[in-house]
């Protein structure tokens, strides 16, 4: 383990891991062409892990204000303080919108947080997860046990491999819900934002089945969101909706979700029919929900005018 760098020497600055700024020593700065001209910074107390997998650079550091932080290729994936907002919303927005989901697939999600949330639903009998990078799984189990606890559920089956290839091999109509917990559409996750992938998702869902996928920031990526919405409206013949929530350590402080259903029993994503109570005590080892509730579920679909105009313009 190495302490965060606090020296201005050129030699030490050259050895800084990805994302740790040499302009402000001891700070992590998230800089990417996905959000040009801006950066979000966290003070680094200690670097806990640095590694390079077959797919990406992986880093974990202890921050002074957000607990431990998981970083992939210089981009924050989660922090202990605010991971609840993302994990709870991407799981419960789809699963609370359909009655008694039984078979769920998670694409990505190697930290285990989505699994933790899916496991709250007692109707679920099978949870498959396909994560391409085993290092993410191993690092999460080591440094984020409260997140990776999802892997301990006996209903979970972990598949290490490419999510696109996995979906193509899935028999038609297998899943009630598919959750795509991907990183940004660059590098290993790029295919998860393209039309052929969504076609495979639709095929793998039962009639009236639902998908929820990470869908970027309305402040930074409306051009990407516009393409995602257009593709989904062509492919999914049920409901197609965009929702969003706040996550302080994500670029612009917000993140969006694309929610779609296949043709079949109608799905009203905006009004949950399968509510999950934060205080239901359904598991002695499961902590209460920190972020999600039925009110915030419905509110997530209320869009600012500039985003609503673009997204509605893609309606059939």
From Swiss-Prot:
Pfam families in UniProt: Spermine_synt_N, Spermine_synth
EC number: 2.5.1.16
Active site (record annotation): 181 (proton acceptor)
Pathway: Amine and polyamine biosynthesis; spermidine biosynthesis; spermidine from putrescine: step 1/1
InterPro entries cross-referenced by the UniProt entry: PABS, PABS_CS, SAM-dependent_MTases_sf, Spermi_synthase, Spermi_synthase_euk, Spermidine_synt_N, Spermidine_synt_N_sf
Keyword Transit peptide (UniProt): no
Sites where the protein binds S-adenosyl 3-(methylsulfanyl)propylamine: 56, 87, 111, 131, 162-163, 181
Alphabetical keyword list: Polyamine biosynthesis, Spermidine biosynthesis, Transferase
Binding site for putrescine: 86, 181-184, 250
Gene Ontology biological-process annotations: spermidine biosynthetic process
Top-level EC class: transferase
UniProt catalytic activity: S-adenosyl 3-(methylsulfanyl)propylamine + putrescine = S-methyl-5'-thioadenosine + spermidine + H(+)
Domain of life per record: Eukaryota
GO CC field: cytosol
Domain (PABS): residue spans on this chain: 25-262
GO MF annotation terms: spermidine synthase activity
Membership in a protein family: Belongs to the spermidine/spermine synthase family.
Protein name, UniProt field: Spermidine synthase
Organism of origin: Coffea arabica
């Amino acid at each position: 383990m190495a302490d965060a760098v606090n020296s201005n020497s050129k030699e030490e600055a050259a050895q800084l891991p990805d994302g740790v700024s040499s302009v402000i020593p001891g700070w992590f700065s998230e800089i990417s062409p996905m959000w040009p001209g801006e950066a979000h910074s966290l003070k680094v107390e200690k670097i806990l892990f640095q590694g390079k997998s077959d797919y990406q650079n992986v880093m974990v550091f202890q921050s002074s204000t957000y607990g431990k932080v998981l970083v992939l290729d210089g981009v924050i994936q989660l922090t202990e303080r605010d991971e609840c907002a993302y994990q709870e919303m991407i799981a419960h927005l789809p699963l609370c919108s359909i009655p008694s989901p039984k078979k769920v697939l998670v694409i990505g999600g190697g930290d285990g947080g989505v699994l933790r949330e899916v496991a709250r639903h007692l109707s679920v009998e099978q949870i498959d997860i396909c994560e391409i990078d085993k290092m993410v799984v191993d690092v999460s189990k080591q440094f984020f046990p409260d997140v990776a606890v999802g892997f301990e559920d006996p209903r979970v089956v972990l598949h290490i491999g490419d999510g696109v290839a996995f979906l193509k091999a899935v028999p038609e109509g297998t899943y009630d819900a598919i959750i795509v917990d991907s990183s940004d559409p660059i590098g290993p996750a790029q295919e998860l934002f393209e039309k052929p992938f969504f076609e495979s998702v639709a095929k793998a869902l039962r009639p009236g089945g639902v998908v929820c996928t990470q869908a970027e920031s309305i402040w930074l990526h409306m051009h990407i969101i516009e393409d995602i919405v257009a593709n989904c409206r062509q492919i999914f013949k049920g409901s197609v909706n965009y929702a969003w929530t706040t996550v302080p350590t994500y670029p612009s402080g917000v993140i969006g979700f694309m929610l779609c259903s296949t043709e079949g029993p109608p799905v009203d994503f905006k009004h949950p029919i399968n509510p999950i109570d934060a205080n239901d005590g359904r598991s002695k080892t499961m902590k209460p929900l920190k972020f999600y509730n039925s009110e915030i579920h419905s509110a997530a679909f209320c869009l600012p005018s500039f985003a609503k105009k673009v997204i509605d313009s893609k309606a059939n």
